[in-house]
Amino acid sequence: MTRQAIVAANWKMNGDSALVDTMVSGLADIELSSHVDVVICPSFPYLSELNQKIKAANLNEAIHVGSQNVSEHESGAYTGEVSTAMLQNLAINYVIVGHSERRSIFKETSTQVAKKVHAALNAGLTPILCIGESEAERATGETETVLSAQIQPVIDEIGIEKFKDVVIAYEPVWAIGTGKTASSAMAQETHQFIRKFLAQQNEQVADKVPLLYGGSVNAANCEELFAQTDIDGGLIGGASLKAEQFKIICSAAKGK
């Protein structure tokens, strides 16, 4: 079946107002089909600015703004956190949840990630759930076990039916920012496993979930990756900071 193709830019802790301007002007003439969503996720201080400039450039139908994180709590004494209501107030559509850097550096657990997915869905936001294994885990044949253990708590939290409103981004930890990329065949094999894992509980829902690949995706390898049956787009890191590269990657998703 035809699923929504998504190309999401994760700027991480990079960029400034100048990058916002460069990206909006660089994407001004982007041509996309209706089944491709482009999402740009800057750091929190630039969410509103990016949204306003996208609207001013009449790009708001083609490009959405997303957050790199969100709290699982509605409000309260959680210094430094940002709630779903705050993102709603800024007209944010997407939110990245459970990125490997959040899991490893900030010690977010799969249970906490599941609660963040739930909070995002309750607020009408589309969560981009990140999962992925380390190089050591792949070397010892644990990839499927690790991914299952990251997905199952979310199923337990929200139920499989609600996955029709969830995007999953598979990012092998060993490929993030390293220049290493899973081969297209390896990426497809893992994406196929993820879809089959979901299908064990609900095949119809599994067929609808967009699965993105992340991990050193660039203008040179995006077309081959996106040509794979179960890869519906990408979560892009370093290459998303360069407007010309990012435009090429977005255009490659048109073939999905």
From Swiss-Prot:
Domain of life: Bacteria
Entry GO MF terms: triose-phosphate isomerase activity
Active-site feature positions: H99 (electrophile), E171 (proton acceptor)
Presence of keyword Protein biosynthesis: no
Any one GO cellular component localisation term in the record: cytosol
Listed EC numbers: 5.3.1.1
Its biological purpose: Involved in the gluconeogenesis. Catalyzes stereospecifically the conversion of dihydroxyacetone phosphate (DHAP) to D-glyceraldehyde-3-phosphate (G3P).
Protein name in the entry: Triosephosphate isomerase
Organism from which the protein derives: Colwellia psychrerythraea (strain 34H / ATCC BAA-681)
Lineage, uppermost ranks: Bacteria, Pseudomonadati, Pseudomonadota, Gammaproteobacteria, Alteromonadales
